[in-house]
Amino acid sequence: MTSPFLQRHVGPSDSEQQQMLSALGYADMAAFLADVVPEDILDEFPPQGLLPPGCGEAEALVHLREIAAANNSRRSLIGLGYYGTSTPALIQRHVFENPAWYTAYTPYQAEIAQGRLEALLNFQTLISELTGLPIANASLLDEATAAAEAMSLSYGICRRTEANRFLVDANVLPQTWAVLQTRAEPLGIDLERVTPEQASFDASVFGVLLQLPGADGQIWDPTAVIARAHEAGALVTVAIDPLAQALIAPVASFGADIAVGSAQRFGVPMGFGGPHAAFFATKDTYKRQIPGRLVGQSRDSAGNPALRLALQTREQHIRRDKATSNICTAQVLLAVMASFYAVHHGPEGLMSIARRIVGQRRQLERALQSLGFVVPDGERFDTVTVTSALAPAVHQAVGEAGFNLRVLPDGANPAESTGFGIALDECTTADELSRLVAALATAAGQTSPSLPLAPVEELCGVPERVDPWLSQSVFHDHLSETELMRYIQRLVSRDLSLVHGMIPLGSCTMKLNAAAELLPVSWPAFAGLHPFAPMAQAAGYQRLAEQLEAWLAALTGFAAVSLQPNAGSQGEYAGLLVIRAWHRSRGDDHRDVCLIPTSAHGTNPASAVMAGLKVVAVACDADGNIDQQDLAARAAEHADRLAALMVTYPSTHGVFETGIRGICELVHRHGGQVYLDGANLNAQVGLCRPGAFGADVCHLNLHKTFCIPHGGGGPGVGPIGVADHLAPFLPGHPMQASPDQAIGPVSAAALGSASILPISWMYLRMMGAEALRQATAVALLSANYLALRLDPHYPVLFRGATGRVAHECILDLRPLKRDAGIDVDDIAKRLMDYGFHAPTVSWPVAGTVMVEPTESESLAELDRFADAMIAIRNEIRDIESGAMDASNNPLKQAPHTMAAVIAEDWDRPYSRQQAAFPLPDQQQNKVWPAVARIDNAYGDRNLICTCPSVEEIAVAVAA
């Protein structure tokens, strides 16, 4: 039986699908699929029996509630980078649960993304003010990988050939240490764990990572250590707690070169490990090496301030194997939440929360001392760690009282532990503290002491923050809920997302993110768990993960799946590390060559380099396919050293290549493994399986194919599926039992961004195998329908052997530059006037656009987009004929803002109506660009990546 959810997920009705098939010349869907998907990989039937049959929303939610109920939401005071936090209801309602925020894409088209960019600029300003460093990025994946990025940056900047040592604070978070080990080994970096004050620095040291506060809560003044590191020519990274930093002097004042951390405790639930927005701040000197997205201010064609992504030439999609990082998708939605949390509280509110935690921690320490526990000397922020023979009794007593504490040593059985750690947080109350102390007293065999008031004196041993901070008006003007609600809505009105219309970005799969799929993410049973809570308390998450892994394995034809990678780029990296580990287990350490087609996503070569592999390019032929003769030559040339081929399927040119089985067999004959980039898996689900036609590893983008929303640039999840012989090498984690051959972790938490996995679970549970197959078929049909409509106006550049495209098509705009002086950016900006986000521009071929409609868009929406593109082509024809001016025309002047259209003066040779309302239906559904066309070059030359201060505004007003 067909899933009742199918008609909600798929846009075109049955009759509309038949209409589209008829337009393409097919009698039915089966005939169409036989023409599109190569016969030798097309599965006759979907994997029935391996997935449950589809069901409705209510039934799926009932099943998922049963799973969630198996989680035990004890109050976790474990700390280690994850803390209880109170998400303001306003932010949960108007941001986290608002599709205008979570369905947008990365803000490449900045003129229709000003709201999101402003929220991210607020985030960057927050981090810059907390750290005292002038440049902060718009988020990274988690604190551990941010620290690894800092290590890589430090290594890349160092020019001393003998420098390959990276010193790491012994008090670093355990997950950070583990991720650093994973990242360092393939790059030839020697890690050394040290007590910072006792560390020796010489010319072999290129960088240092300090933790402030440390994993045990200690805070200290690192100024002298940093000075010694600088004398030896090493860069210093400090991993910070942003809430502690509200009280501690900015780390830049200690001399830090880089600061990293997680903004999780700024209003984002723990969620069993993620997703959370990490951050990376540094000195201006290193702005061109900073990983991830960077929002900067520029100006538009009218001279008004405008925001956009800055310094993009340093990123992986341009620099490829020379990129500073493979990061693309990060954690924009979570960074936006954290920024609004800071706007909601303001600097005084943040400091008040931090002071309250310090006071409660001092109360706790006095109670511990009165019970006979030895509290270590030194100053702390929120955490106290105690070594005691009573530790097993403590863990039992606090567990019975409903608490989890850190078990020392990390990973030990509580019954055999030698100590415990207690981390207080924003959610700690006086009553909770009393119950905790009572449990500690029970363990000590004593009467519970009263909790004396503990006034917050000055922090000892570390300079405090004394200068004003967050003086920007945005952090002071919205402290009332009314003002903040209106501010959030103002930003929403400056953005375009799926609530406005189709976003036809090729290779991005902007499909429906159904409300029922997202609803469970905010359930406390999923949101409230600490990732290092005892596994027995996470039985629901384990069951969810096991089912999701099994379903994904069935759909892809692989033997095993890891859900740990928290982005597609990290899935690539993890998959290549798995291949590398397999080769090394066989004594083939010398296999280090990775073949990559020149058409590949930029993350492919960037990930290969990170995995310690040497990239060898493989040519593509005139039809966009892998040049199989060149592939055979390269495979033969490097046969003794061949580790892997990275291949995207369907290809990045939007077609099913007919020789994929032969390609896989060729690589295997030469001793290599096949890594399949799953960015285009939405064209395969239910129709063909990578594991069945020869791939050994494939990463899946749950934020594309399996309905996790893009969030304006994250979160994402990039799990990997592997063949049976590679399963023992899937990523492990230091806080859980892992197979002996497992590679190290690639994410801070064992399940990566665990709290958004219910989204994909809901999608698969509601759809079932047959509906998934139908959805994929409609995605292919919609792309071919658009190709049919648009080809007479914009030639489709690449087609498969039967003349069909896969789930996306590339339109060739290059002749328009020659004939009319119109380039791809002109068309992208003009589409905004028609109410559309542009397709992917100039990738994988410069001067083209790649269109991917997905299965979720109705025939009416497909036609609306086609009508807009055709209308723009007719405007270009007017330029070609001379009927319209070559420079002063609707395309060159696009996009048109409301301010421009209603201005008293209108000196353009076309009407205001043609500028703003070129199609009749726009009178009722107009999306206005917030700014005119942005001058990107000006912004990069005059880089401004934070909000202006009050003083800067005053100077500007006076001028």
Swiss-Prot record:
SUPFAM superfamilies: PLP-dependent transferases (SSF53383). The keyword Magnesium does not apply. GO terms for cellular component: cytosol; glycine cleavage complex. One of its GO terms (biological process) is glycine decarboxylation via glycine cleavage system. It catalyses: N(6)-[(R)-lipoyl]-L-lysyl-[glycine-cleavage complex H protein] + glycine + H(+) = N(6)-[(R)-S(8)-aminomethyldihydrolipoyl]-L-lysyl-[glycine-cleavage complex H protein] + CO2. Its cofactor is pyridoxal 5'-phosphate. Keywords: Oxidoreductase, Pyridoxal phosphate. The modification N6-(pyridoxal phosphate)lysine is found at residue 704. Belongs to the GcvP family. The glycine cleavage system is composed of four proteins: P, T, L and H. This is Glycine dehydrogenase (decarboxylating). The lineage of its organism: Bacteria, Bacillati, Cyanobacteriota, Cyanophyceae, Synechococcales.
